[in-house]
């Protein structure tokens, strides 16, 4: 009987959550991410994507592309995590087992769809999306096919806010023209090998013989990719254990001999790991840098922050402070950066622009034995905010509360005045009020209150307090 695997992907999830809870932002080009000089876009609304802005892009570059109308919002991960839990509560109730890939996407294989027609699958997916939209207010896209690969490609075709079903007899119409890099597992190295063979599309790979694939790519990985290219994907949908660490490392054909080469390698690995961290939706408390020297010695050093963060500038700065160079340890062959101590809830940093200054790790003692890790912690290393910053108290996009006007968010602050827009998910576009910076009635608020899901939080034991 026909097997149907579905892939659901929330549309521009972080930005959609901001537009949901702050009606003023609906229809505007929203960029979610760090505001520091090395800030990175964690999420971009479709209005911002029209200008070429995208996730993982340096914030200054995204702002330049969008122009004067760009709205930059500090991430509120506690809101995104709560929204994700509510979305997948709905998905699991309808579909049963769900294989979560990240905070905003997952696979499912509903028993009710075994042997179903493409039309029935489309109707089921539309009903799921409609319930998610009705309950949470958030848009989603669903792809469906005979396996995970095609389902995930299908959800990309469905975006934004749609369903794309790929019948078995039509799957090669979708797969064959796509670049071979669209296949799961085809990275730069494999892609380079395939290119040298004249393989540019998935159809080109599917047309190879089994012997050609085994000789060029190996009997295990090669055949797996070949099967995916031919539309054969029997991987089961099953729950995944939550990742405890996110990392990326690269081995170099030629030894790294200069500081500049090592710096470039750290940036390459840090950026790759950070892209995966953003997709995961959690923040990291611990940063580690791994080096393997030309003589195969391995050195790994780590540093633990006092809070979890996904701010790229902070994480990169920490990695650089952990780095060692050829003048100290000799020629280097491998460089890796990893993030661990992953947490859904992270400390709300009042002064995000000071993040990089907080990281002042002492020089750790290094053990050169293979696999031994030395570490240090930031628990005893604190940098106080300057008095003029500390007195300011308010930062743009911060959640606040006023006893007369209710929940709102800071639109701007300066010269002794703070402007607040009062609105939540369940209101219309809110009005703006200005207050003295030290007005006692204006207080910091729980970001979760902007969702107006008090009943659901009570039923599910959810709170906005960090544990």
Curated annotation (Swiss-Prot):
Residues 5-187 form the UmuC domain. One of its GO terms (molecular function) is damaged DNA binding. One of its GO terms (biological process) is error-prone translesion synthesis. GO terms for cellular component: cytosol. Keywords: Cytoplasm, DNA damage, DNA repair, DNA replication, DNA-binding, DNA-directed DNA polymerase, Magnesium, Metal-binding, Mutator protein, Nucleotidyltransferase, Transferase. It holds the Pfam family IMS_HHH_1. It catalyses: DNA(n) + a 2'-deoxyribonucleoside 5'-triphosphate = DNA(n+1) + diphosphate. It is an enzyme of class 2 (transferase). Binds 2 magnesium ions per subunit. InterPro entries: DNA/RNA_pol_sf (IPR043502), DNA_pol_Y-fam_lit_finger_sf (IPR036775), DNA_pol_Y-fam_little_finger (IPR017961), DNA_polymerase-Y (IPR050116), DNApol_IV (IPR022880), IMS_HHH_1 (IPR053848), Rev_trsase/Diguanyl_cyclase (IPR043128), UmuC (IPR001126). Disulfide bonds: none annotated. The record marks 14 as: Substrate discrimination. Its cofactor is Mg(2+). Residues 364-386, 428-449 are annotated as: Disordered. Poorly processive, error-prone DNA polymerase involved in untargeted mutagenesis. Copies undamaged DNA at stalled replication forks, which arise in vivo from mismatched or misaligned primer ends. These misaligned primers can be extended by PolIV. Exhibits no 3'-5' exonuclease (proofreading) activity. May be involved in translesional synthesis, in conjunction with the beta clamp from PolIII. Monomer. NCBIfam families: PRK02406.1 (NF002677), PRK03348.1 (NF002882). Belongs to the DNA polymerase type-Y family. This is DNA polymerase IV. It comes from Corynebacterium glutamicum (strain R). The gene is dinB.
